Amino acid sequence: MDSVDRFLYTSDHDGFLALTRETWQNRWFPSQIPLHLDVSHVHQLSDADKDFYRFLFTFLGMAERLVNFNIEDLVTNFNSHDVAHYYAEQVAMENIHGVVYANILKIFFNNSRGELLAYAAKIILDPALCEKLEWLHSRVRKATTKAQKILMFLIVEGIYFISSFYSISLCRVRGIMPGVCLANDYISRDELLHTKAASMLYNTMVEIQEKPSHAEVQALFREAVNIEIRFIQAKAAGVTLVNVVDIRRFLEATADRILRDIFVPPIFGTPPPEACPLSYTGSFKAVNFFERDNSDYTTCVTDDL
């Protein structure tokens, strides 16, 4: 008879248990994102700005299906109650992200589903997006070992959306779209937690002899950063405050942070921009998440980069 251990819960990974509790403490819902003020701000955007953000939010709204990285398939590689519980929570949070992006897209497309679908069908053929997706799907197909799959998961969670989050956060600097900015804070912080989890998975659930060489991992991250910067560079011309040089610096600093987290030497040595608009960067938060509609997590984040 199979061991009954797999049916009866007992904590078997302190790190993932802590991450699950952190997710519980910081759970949020689409109803907490007020978008009524954002409607007039969207209408006031320049054509270049509106096109840029419509593109980003449509990409983000489709990302769960476009990226097609199956968390459940990954988790089946590990016989751990706490890992399975954490990733069940992560899937739930990703579903919330999808609902919020759908709400934001209603503003950008005047609540017209037909207009959104027509636009989505057009951008799915966009060369910058196609290159990004083709690179990812090619790499995912080549990832046959457990270690390689986790590294690709880490790329998706930690690098793949960073230029979009950074660009959206610039709206706060401009004093526009407060609901969108709040959602971006919540979602980017969730992704930071997801990156932390993927790093923990790599560090604690993969034997050292199974891991690729440092050089292979570094090459993968270098490719990912270059793909991401080309993606945003192709769309950023003429967009207010979007500085591709600063975004590259942030991407490189983020890649180095993740590499250090998985005990691989950093490759860029780039400091993040001094005036980084993503609020979790270098911040220290100790405010109860539910006291008010702000972007403070119950978890403290220090020296993120």
From Swiss-Prot:
Keywords: DNA replication, Host membrane, Iron, Membrane, Metal-binding, Oxidoreductase, Transmembrane, Transmembrane helix. The keyword Chloroplast does not apply. Its EC number is 1.17.4.1. Its main location: host cell. It is a single-pass membrane protein. It comes from the Viruses. One of its GO terms (biological process) is deoxyribonucleotide biosynthetic process. PANTHER family: RIBONUCLEOSIDE-DIPHOSPHATE REDUCTASE SMALL CHAIN, RIBONUCLEOSIDE-DIPHOSPHATE REDUCTASE SUBUNIT M2. This is Ribonucleoside-diphosphate reductase small subunit. It comes from Human herpesvirus 8 type P (isolate GK18).
